[in-house]
């Protein structure tokens, strides 16, 4: 346990008295303000020792989302579809749908004709629901009621039963709202929208301009270390299969720049440090996977050339707000930020000590919430701490006023 040393610099105040005697009207000089207390030995800032991925001049996906998806799928090919993605269906349910589909397409001699028969049956028999319905494929098959997600799920299952590759896409129906549709392989990629009875070649961007894909329910690329998908309009590092203590996020895969690191499975337990290169634009928007899937990480560092985010200490910031705080960090020294608003740091289970920088004016109520192991906060004397700024922290929590010297 490192000792804390408090260095108090005291001033000797000398009072000058007039030489002409006790009847002088001169007042003693006003002492200078006390200089701040300094705290040493915290060791909150740990310099990175690993490396960032180097720019390899890979291709940037800088077109429309639909064109970016087309480039990725053309590169990946149909073999990426090895199953039905995240569709929820039991073996018995799948068998029943397959038996029905086998009879439906009996006599159809080409994959295109099989597809057309299945597509026709869905668009003719499934009705768009006005209220809540279960959009898993089997309930849709049984009730003949669905919204767009149910249409797309059932189409994928029925095509899969006939060995035709299909994946579900989620995104936006332009000027309408959220939508789901399919990408289907029939000697080339097709866009299939059973909800709206739409079907066209993927390369026909004019016919598909009303569809704006955000995510695909399929793995695009995979190697011995990493798995990649298309998520939130980015080529995303979805899974890290193996790594040492220091994880360098790759710059590219299969000739395309990787711009997102948002895993949906746990990182290897060995990973304690993450090195995020200048290529990464996002760690997630609606869901930040590192918050849930990086339990052993203590430090995250961002390349200084990254224009979307930065790191200070072990914390990643975006727009002056903590974007990612490693789950296993125990001592955290934050950037100089004027105001720590509500939920500045919330639900962190391992942090024990936080250090606030000079220049921070206010810690608002509930700035730190539900951090059960947080026991110490080092805060400059001039920083205002609102009531309940530290809420649901350790029972022995204590604030020490002073400035931590690196």
Name what the model sees in each region.
Residues 15-42:
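Bacterial Sec-dependent N-terminal signal peptides
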Residues 32-98:
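N-terminal module-boundary/linker segments of secreted carbohydrate-active enzymes
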Residues 225, 230, 242-259, 268-282, ...:
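Structural signature of tandem-repeat unit edges
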């Amino acid at each position: 346990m490192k000792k804390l040393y408090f260095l108090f610099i005291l001033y000797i105040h000398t009072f000058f008295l007039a030489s002409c005697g006790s009847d002088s009207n001169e007042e003693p000089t006003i002492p200078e303000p006390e200089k701040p207390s300094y705290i040493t030995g915290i060791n909150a800032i740990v310099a990175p020792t690993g490396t960032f991925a180097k720019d390899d001049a890979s291709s940037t996906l800088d077109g429309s989302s639909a064109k970016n998806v087309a480039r990725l799928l053309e590169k990946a090919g149909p073999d990426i579809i090895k199953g039905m993605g995240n569709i929820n269906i039991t073996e018995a349910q799948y068998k029943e749908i397959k038996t029905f589909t086998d009879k439906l397409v009996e006599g159809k001699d080409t994959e295109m004709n099989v597809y057309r028969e299945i597509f026709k049956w869905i668009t003719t028999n499934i009705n768009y629901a006005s209220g809540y319905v279960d959009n898993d494929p089997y309930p849709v098959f049984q009730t003949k009621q669905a919204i767009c997600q149910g249409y797309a799920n059932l189409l994928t299952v029925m095509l899969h039963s006939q060995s035709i590759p299909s994946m579900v896409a989620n995104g936006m129906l332009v000027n309408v709202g959220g939508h789901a549709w399919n990408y289907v392989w029939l000697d080339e990629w097709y866009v299939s929208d059973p909800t709206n009875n739409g079907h066209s070649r993927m390369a026909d961007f004019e016919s598909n301009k009303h569809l704006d894909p955000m995510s695909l329910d399929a793995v695009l690329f995979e190697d011995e270390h990493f798995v990649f998908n298309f998520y939130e309009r980015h080529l995303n590092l979805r899974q890290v299969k193996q790594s040492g203590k220091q994880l360098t996020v790759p710059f590219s895969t299969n000739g395309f720049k990787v711009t997102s690191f948002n895993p949906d499975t746990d990182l290897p337990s060995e990973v304690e440090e993450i090195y995020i290169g200048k290529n990464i634009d996002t760690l997630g928007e609606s869901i930040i996977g590192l918050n849930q899937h990086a339990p052993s990480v203590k430090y995250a560092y961002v390349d200084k050339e990254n224009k979307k985010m930065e790191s200070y200490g072990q914390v990643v910031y975006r727009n002056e707000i903590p974007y990612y705080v490693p789950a296993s960090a125990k001592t955290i020294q934050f950037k100089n930020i004027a105001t720590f608003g509500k939920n500045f740091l919330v639900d962190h289970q391992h942090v024990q000590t936080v250090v606030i920088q000079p220049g921070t004016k206010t810690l608002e109520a509930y700035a730190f919430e539900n951090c059960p192991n947080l026991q110490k906060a080092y805060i400059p004397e001039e920083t205002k701490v609102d009531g309940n700024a530290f809420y649901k922290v350790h029972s022995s929590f204590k604030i020490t006023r002073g400035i931590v010297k690196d």
